[in-house]
């Protein structure tokens, strides 16, 4: 994931900062508890495509 892209993308729900989870290849919004997938290296920033974080993931 290009760090320059991380500087400009935002959560589509709350417009907050997204963090890259390298292990799961996801962009994570800790505020909303959502993880957005990457497909072929492209972030899919659609709320209906996001995965809800588990309680453990939210507090990690």
Swiss-Prot record:
PANTHER family, alphabetized: PROTEIN PREY, MITOCHONDRIAL (PTHR33505:SF4), ZGC:162634 (PTHR33505)
Identification of the protein by name: UPF0434 protein Spro_1718
Protein family according to the UniProt entry: Belongs to the UPF0434 family.
UniProt cross-references to Gene3D superfamilies, sorted A to Z: 2.20.25.10
One matching Pfam family: Trm112p
A GO CC term assigned to this protein in UniProt: cytosol
Top-level lineage group: Bacteria
Organism name: Serratia proteamaculans (strain 568)
